[in-house]
């Protein structure tokens, strides 16, 4: 098929994302723009849009495109990761719809998300983190939940207002592991996660003893409803107070204030 790329990209954007994945128009527009940028890049390196074939999209070429975004367009690491997420999604789709070049698809899907140089939660030291989770009783359902909330906040630098909306579908459970975080203005960013943390998420979901759907919120309250910002703030403050009693020199800054 001479125009295999345009054919499958059109099906991906107009059929697969809205009908099978249930993505909203804002997310689809973001994905579409990612491919507009890719096509413009390919034009710059001598491949016109109407001539692009799937075989042209190699791992090396995708990596060059991502570096171009960061170095030539001055895109942030977060934006770079968002473009890569769109590309990953397309090649996951191709694995089943057009598996002719599946070995190359696998290489592209193994391109990792790039880690930011600094963590936003720099005010929470490793020592404070260890002390904080050390006072949590993980033997009960809600203690285990609180433990996972604090681990996720430290691992991803997610804010409370973003954390309460996290769903299972937001995690990528295959390499490269990541979480999609939706922030203010419905802006999305993709944050890399460690394999160890992904394993903890899977263990946590299994511990719930009820079938969670991909679209369900990961963290819920006693009524099985989504946690509120105030609810998470209460959880954080509770453990900080306990940890402070044992370690008065730690937690000089207000954790909750920084994470809202």
Model-assigned labels for residue ranges:
Residues 1-260:
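Conserved catalytic core of the tyrosine transesterase superfamily
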């Amino acid at each position: 098929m001479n125009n295999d790329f345009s054919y499958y990209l059109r099906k991906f954007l107009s059929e697969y994302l809205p009908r099978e994945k249930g993505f909203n128009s804002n997310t689809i527009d973001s994905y579409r723009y990612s491919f507009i940028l890719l096509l413009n890049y390919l034009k710059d390196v001598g491949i016109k849009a109407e001539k692009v074939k799937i075989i042209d999209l190699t791992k090396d070429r995708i990596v060059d495109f991502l570096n171009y975004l960061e170095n030539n367009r001055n895109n942030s690491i977060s934006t770079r990761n968002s473009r890569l997420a769109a590309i990953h999604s397309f090649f996951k789709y191709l694995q089943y719809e057009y598996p002719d070049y599946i070995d190359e698809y696998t290489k592209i899907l193994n391109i990792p998300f790039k880690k930011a140089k600094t963590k936003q939660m720099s005010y929470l030291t490793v020592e404070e983190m260890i002390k904080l989770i050390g006072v949590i009783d993980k033997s009960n359902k809600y203690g285990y939940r609180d433990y996972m909330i604090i681990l996720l906040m430290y691992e991803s630098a997610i804010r409370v207002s973003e954390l309460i909306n996290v769903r299972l579908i937001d995690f990528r459970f295959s390499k490269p592991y990541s979480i999609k975080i939706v922030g203010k203005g419905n802006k999305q960013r993709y944050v890399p996660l460690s394999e160890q943390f992904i394993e903890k998420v899977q263990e946590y979901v299994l511990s719930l003893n009820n079938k969670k759907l991909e679209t369900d919120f990961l963290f819920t309250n006693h009524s099985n409803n989504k946690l509120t910002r105030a609810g998470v703030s209460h959880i954080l403050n509770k453990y900080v107070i306990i940890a402070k009693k044992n370690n008065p020199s730690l937690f000089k800054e207000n954790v909750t204030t920084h994470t809202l």
